[in-house]
């Protein structure tokens, strides 16, 4: 059965993920290293992991499998999800794929180096309504595609 894993720290689309999951009766694991407001939603499993680098990522990567979806802005976690056969979506709805993950990791490393050397300041554009809409469409499309696949 497909499950959705949300890397929840700084994730702007948690509510949207729950809406899509609810439409399909899917469990959503919202994983964070800080406290969250309880949702009380029967399909939502809120997981608070200890603080520390990559603890939430490790929790998700250990559990996600071939029929699952990982929602994250963390490119290394997306790469780990793809290695396990899971689908991976960014917060803006752009899918990470085997074909795109290498370039995404390289760009991440380049941007980090530019920030560290002072050649670049800060992040990208603000999260927009278009990003939110793209995310909803992409997650819906991903759920539908997984449901059409034969089980592993």
Swiss-Prot record:
Residues 128-140 have a biased composition (Basic and acidic residues). It comes from the Bacteria. Signal peptide: none annotated. Pfam families: DUF188. Residues 114-152 are annotated as: Disordered. HAMAP family: UPF0178. NCBIfam families: PRK00124.1 (NF001095). Belongs to the UPF0178 family. This is UPF0178 protein Plav_1521.
